[in-house]
Amino acid sequence: MMNEKWGSGDPKQSLTDLTFAAYDDHHYIKYAGLPTTKSAYLQEACTTDRSGNWPVFVGEWSLSVDSSVENTDDWKPDHDVDFYKKFWAAQVMSYEKTAGGWIFWSWKTTGLNDPRWDYQMAVDRGIIDRNPDTAYDVGAC
């Protein structure tokens, strides 16, 4: 069920038993209304607290950035692999610290050709390491 951070009321009000229940949080920093600077994105990723209701898992997230800059040269993943490595690592660490874990938007997309939404492509392009534990070695936060 959706976490209280969705702002749609008490997700437990209609449930009589919470055994085996967990909350799902979809967190897309792309839509956070941040200043379009890489430091603002890293700051948000490093400090976000997704805890709210417990247990919660971040069941959807990506490396996408605001639509106004996502296709500019400065923000294209192939032009700044280092930023996207840090952006990925910061989110992984935050979601593992303040939630019960995470699930990236998609393992593989068709036709999109954007590693910000495609985990396998991000691995192939060197943005995400094959071993997700390396997030703690990137020095993102």
What are these regions (language model features)?
Residues 16-30, 124-141:
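Short, Lys/Arg-enriched charge-dense amphipathic segments
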Residues 1-89:
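Extracellular glycoside hydrolase catalytic/binding regions
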Residues 52-139:
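Substrate-binding cleft of secreted/luminal carbohydrate-active enzymes
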